[in-house]
């Protein structure tokens, strides 16, 4: 298992595979115990955009970013996950929990932890509404 002190967004080994939920999904390559931090914001890997920065981009780039970004409910900035965390699919019964996004407790963002033990080969799922203001407005 990777050490928590390491600079990264995803703190567990994962792989991308076709998902029964939607398109590609993020799957655990190792056992992840309940409570383990799976993801955290890293300003060296992730990018933040405000609405005017997105609007200034070509339409194709805007579409790509709006697909993969989440809108932080506290800062109202769009966050693009620079690694495969952006392939976490939505579930109303996720195996992860998102902590601190409304308060911006971790570098202005939150963290994602395992809500229960996650087995190798299991898809890592999150509830977009717990950290994405657009999803709270019904845009999932």
Segments the model singles out, each with a brief description of its role:
Residues 2-19, 60-134:
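Catalytic core of the SET domain in histone-lysine N-methyltransferases
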Residues 46-62, 135-140:
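Short, compositionally biased
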Residues 42-43, 77:
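Intrinsically disordered, low-complexity proline/glycine-rich segments
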Residues 33-34, 38, 46-48:
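Catalytic strand-loop segment that frames the active site of acyl-thioester-processing enzymes
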Residues 25, 31, 116-119:
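Residue-level "contact hotspot" at macromolecular interaction interfaces
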Residues 18-27:
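Short aromatic-glycine motifs in intrinsically disordered, low-complexity regions
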């Amino acid at each position: 298992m990777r050490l928590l002190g390491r600079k990264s967004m995803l703190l567990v080994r994962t792989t991308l595979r076709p998902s029964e939920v939607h398109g590609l999904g993020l799957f655990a390559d190792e056992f992840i115990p309940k409570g383990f931090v799976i993801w955290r914001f890293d300003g060296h890997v992730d990018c933040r955009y405000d609405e005017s920065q997105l609007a200034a981009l070509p339409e194709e780039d805007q579409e790509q970013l709006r697909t993969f970004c989440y809108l932080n409910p506290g800062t109202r900035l769009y966050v693009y996950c620079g690694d495969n965390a952006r392939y976490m699919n939505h579930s109303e019964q996720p195996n992860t929990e998102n902590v601190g996004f409304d308060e911006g407790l971790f570098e202005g963002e939150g963290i994602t932890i395992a809500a229960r033990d996650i087995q190798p080969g299991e898809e890592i799922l999150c509830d977009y509404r717990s950290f994405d203001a657009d999803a709270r407005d019904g845009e999932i």
